[in-house]
Amino acid sequence: MIELIQNTGIQFIEIPLKINEDDNLSSEKSFAEEIIYDENGKEESGSILFPYKWNDSYVDFDSINAEAIDRNGDVIPEEIREDFIKIIDKSNIYKVRGREAFDVYTGHWIPLPYFRTRNDRSKPFHSGPHDWCRMWFGEVDLETQKKENSTHKIVLAFDTDTIDNEQGNYLKPNHSDATSSGNTRFKCVIKERFFTDFYSRAEIDSWLSNIYDLKVNRSKNYFRHYANYFVLLDILDQANGFPEIALLTDDKTIETGLVLDIGNSRTCGLIVETTSPKPNTTFDFTSSKKLQIRDLSIPYQVNEEPFEMQVAFAEEKFGNEASDYFSDVFQWPSLLRIGKEAVRLTSIFESEDSQATMSSPKRYLWDYSESSLPWIKVDKDGYIGYNQHENLRKAALFGIAEYLNTDGTVSKSGFPTTESNYSRASLMTFALVEILYQALTQINNHSYRKDMGNSSFRRILKNIVITCPTAMTAKEQIYLKESIEAAVFLVKKQYPNSLHQELKIHPFENEISFEDSEKPWKYDEATCSQITYLYSEMVDKFKGRHELFFKYKGKKRKNTLFPSKESVTIATVDIGGGTTDLMICNYQADAESEIPIIKPIPVFWEGFNVAGDDIVKRIIEFVILPSFEKYLKEQEGINVDETLNYLFGSNLGNQAATHRIYRKQFANQIATYCAYEAINHVNTNSVNRKKTIGDVFKIYPKPKNNLIPYIEDVIKRKCHLATFNFFDVLIDFHTELINYAIADIIKPVVDQLTKLIGVFDCDVLLLSGKSSNLAIIRELFEKSLVLSPDKIINFGNYKFGDWYPFANFGEVKDPKTTVSVGALIAFLSSINKLDKFRIDLNQLSGIQSTAEYLGVLSDNFSRIKDSKLIVEKNKFEGKFMFFGAPVSIGMRQLPSEDWIASSLYVFNFIDDYHKDLLAKEDFEYPFTITISRDEDDKEELLIDEMVIVDKNGYEVEGENYFKLLFKTLPNGLEYWKDNGSFLLKNFSDE
């Protein structure tokens, strides 16, 4: 028996089954059909019949008089009245093999009669609830088969919403169905006569018929879809596939918290319980749970490791189009999917004049402009985003869209948008909505509640903790905060009781705005990694003896809070997917307290937009694509360089829109996986090896669209090759070359960071983020001699101990997780849930912007030459030149022009119309732009106060023609994962 709690949204129950191909999969059920024709011989109506053998005849079971059915539901043959029965011609009777039923309904959501039981053998079920349960059934993948010793899985979905409707149609559970003891029970009805009202509904008929027609061409047996359905239920019931269900009341609650480290490439989450029925309970880290993301298309697949931030618009109905008839049930209002499901949906989407997927919304927090192309939903049945028959785009105007404006912001007018031209920044809100729905489903899942104890208590989300990159711009911090608040608002609109009425988003104790001069975000990623290290050392390894930790790890320093006591200065280099962050903090303990309070003092912080995804791109450009070139030339192909540049380079004038779609798919579905394999190679091998692309894709998922045939066709045609098999291409996994590619992108960053680490006399260097696992990166830090190797700690090799939520026997394979764990520790300390560790983060609120110097970025978008500086440190006005082309303006922290800069603004014409308008005026280039920055916000340039004069000194009315666009993405308006463009060189000839 499984207990669900009322009003906890859609709840999933998984039932593993082991069904061998040799199994009989038999059902004793047999069927016949009655078709009624009109006077013209046209089919008018019909029904499915259930033959019962009586004497030498077969009769329809439903025609047997009630007196001939005993209290157990069995037939009393001698009581059958011949004047009631309907005789069935034996030749019309048929059976359905179990394998056929499996093949028809596998991989589909179908309705399921899970009715309330009653203590009456002749009528063992109430007539409902009808619409609260759906089932998905299918074969599991090989990994799951080995892990769980199962071949198939049933996934039951229950909509636990209850209503006050004792007298009406019994469609949803009533309030009275939920009890504190769970003594009201629900079971799946298998015998057809007990759920005739259920399956005879026209919408159920359409639902099942639509699925059947996808798999089978009907030649006869008009109601065979029903026969398959009944046989499927019978066989799964024989396999004990349908547990008994109880519904508990929702009056007892436990508060939970959600900790999120939202990355450009991946996101990591933890769920914790912050209250307990038992008073004065301290927190046990082993009780925290990893956030799970369920694949709603393949619902038995649940991922609890850090998940991809790829997003794809998709509507989940838990059924086919016929399920639209069922109103106000199974509402999953999220607009998009994330993680592995989004990656898979991206692989089947091909549309030339619309969009449905994006690599990461966090990269586009700066872009609040309305999209020129509409967002449409991916057709999850594989029809490439369009209705198969009508070629009709399905706009993303479902679910939470009723509360949105056209640009994706929350509507205050009450009128929903009719167009899905959402800004790219708004997709951050949509992604957070999906994450919240996934978390809310997880915390009330029966397995979660059973694991945590107090399983009869409803879990309610009270706290959300969010981290951010250490050097994230102030505006992006504001935008991220607004996205979180909008997501919470949208979830509350749909499920008002799912979130605590006093829900808090941390670390925002107070409202923040663009006018704030200090950064509000205490939970920065690099500092959180340091907190994880401190907790592990002080509590786990030094057993709470804080003074010993500082004695053995630190030293006495003059300029500290307590000069007479040891302090530890820790540097963290966090190499994520999109940014590399440095945080140098000095830590001391205030020993006056019974439990020493750790006080971090930030010393230096910095962040660069160069990280793991840039490493992947460089490996593709230095290793993967040159292997393509070499292979094609060995096959005696001609025009190889031109062909590869056409396929994988920048946009060219002779390329169709479909080509650019395939180029993006190649980047994400082929090249990226090949780069991952190269990274795996250098982590595990020193010997050079060659592998075909076919060998690589024995591990990674093959593209399911037309990408491979398209590439093969272009290469055969342009390279004049009679035959070409894409999967035969040899990739040269040369260890030295792969490491060279990694170092080429990351060494300039390491060189700058190690100088600072040496200047600030650090005691420990922590390397966090998944890319820090690369041996070449640690080697670069060791070669700098800034610290002895024993003081350089790579979290990928660090022994945390069994307390760590993501540890496997104390080891952590993915350093990405240290950020969310550190944020959890800091949060628990702030609410006094830790008995051996306290940390005061107040000093971190003084971390301000690193935008000391603003200037025009160089051509490679990574440096600002001194001659191109606009505003220097402690200065508030400057000039730059405009020659008619967009000007990229960036920021850096230090006075050296070799210091890596970050993109901040683009100065350009408002649009082509205003450019043409100005061209009609009598002005000459170059223009000189004088601009000021806000004295209270170092990042803010004031376009309203700019002065523009042309070459001859004539003043131009700038506000009429120009805009200053806040933009943190360098080099174009799209990230390489979103446009698929690579820099190609003829490496094989060098």
Which residues are covered by each model-predicted region?
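Early-domain small/polar-rich strand-loop-helix modules and first-structured segments
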Residues: 1-398, 611, 615-618, 623-627, ...
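Acidic, glycine/GT-rich loop-and beta-edge segments that sit at the periphery of enzyme/chaperone cores
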Residues: 22-33, 218-223, 544-553, 562-564, ...
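Phosphate/oxyanion-binding active-site loops and adjacent basic polyanion-contact surfaces
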Residues: 222-232, 353-357, 419-443, 473-480, ...
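Phosphate/ATP-binding catalytic cores across multiple sugar-kinase/actin-like superfamilies
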Residues: 234-253, 427-456, 530-563, 713-761, ...
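Glycine-rich phosphate-binding loop of actin/hexokinase-like ATP-binding domains
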Residues: 260-301, 524-528, 533-627, 862-863
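Phosphate-binding glycine-rich/basic clefts of nucleotide- and phosphate-handling proteins
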Residues: 281-377, 381-384, 584-721, 832-906
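Glycine-rich phosphate-binding loops at beta-strand->alpha-helix junctions
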Residues: 458, 463-479, 762-781
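Conserved phosphate-binding/catalytic loops in two-lobed NTP-binding clefts
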Residues: 489-524, 528, 782-818
